[in-house]
Amino acid sequence: MITEGAARRVHIIQGEYKVLSDPNAVLSTILGSCVAACLRDPVAGIGGMNHFLLPGSATSPTSGGDATRYGVHLMELLINGLLKQGARRDRLEAKIFGGAKTISTFSNVGEQNAAFAMQFLRDEGIPVVGSSTGGEHGRKLEYWPVSGRARQYPLTGAETQRTVALEQRPAAPQKPVETSIEFF
């Protein structure tokens, strides 16, 4: 058995997802109001995690068009990434984490994120086998995608505020898609 110290750690930041089949890998992230969905196919031995800032989609008029921040986009990418690597939709299971109410003056986007993730998975027929959402403090999350094991650590008030500051920054710019064709 591999000890935790020997695990290959892959950190997921806001707007990212990762799919792995390495039994020695652990996915990690830090969440405030953001949500991480952890999905896996226990038979295929493959799993993954995403980290999204807002529910909904980038097509709404107020979104700014950055799809990587939105739950709809990242949930689809995660599910499709699993299916492309051999998972079967009918065997997928999920765990949901995050969605804290980290700033009292803002609307409760964390609650909206968690509700969105639960509804999305319900609509897709993917059972949620575990969750830890809400509260007033952020979390550090570790997820072993092959075994489905998850562990979280609550953040202190100061750590939560640092996480909130990171979540409010714009997502990293995406590389432009090459749309021109050059003929020789």
From Swiss-Prot:
The keyword tRNA-binding does not apply. GO terms for biological process: chemotaxis. The keyword Membrane does not apply. It is an enzyme of class 3 (hydrolase). Its EC number is 3.5.1.44. Pfam families: CheD. Signal peptide: none annotated. Belongs to the CheD family. Probably deamidates glutamine residues to glutamate on methyl-accepting chemotaxis receptors (MCPs), playing an important role in chemotaxis. NCBIfam families: PRK13497.1 (NF010019). This is Probable chemoreceptor glutamine deamidase CheD. It comes from Rhizobium etli (strain CIAT 652).
